[in-house]
């Protein structure tokens, strides 16, 4: 699926506009059969040599956005995700006293525009729009300030979840980790104040989730600080920060969109496996 600039971006909220002049938008894309990183600038991508986390240099090549295929924007070694991080998603449960994290395998990653595949025996697969933190440096036992500095940028994510398996299985390995259950992208945005951005999830054009990231129970640095007590975080690692409100089941033929101000729109069709 080719994605245009108009499809990618919505303007950031007023509170985030102050950071706009220093924003950098990184993408990962296919040129022919080769994957590369680049900086998105209007309708063009300036190709980089190396990853955004290791002092990349421009190659001099420039590509039209419409001529390339966007991939999930980095290659993490690990993916963590937050449970119960908006009060609107708690139901009758009490707010957690500490960040509640779980794993999603890297094999669950899916590109912008590519399909979410529902396994044949899955009957209650929900979409969960989320802000995703991108780690930019190796960090262990971080202070709050070190945790803040370790967050390279942010992107959009969809924590696809099979609710029946969540309830029935001891572990969430398939409920949260089936192939294609972690669409991410389309860009990593650096320099944006992500503490007060409107997040919206749409299913077939209908808004089913809408809430500000200001309502997170645990903010980005708090999540990174807690996670780094137990797990060494490395450049490119991803942390989904939790989903707001209620969610809805998807079916083959649906299209789901996760939109966050300043970060663009992550759009994926849904197909049967």
Regions found by a protein language model. Name each.
Residues 95-112, 127, 257-261:
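Structural signature of FAD isoalloxazine-binding scaffolds in flavoprotein oxidoreductases
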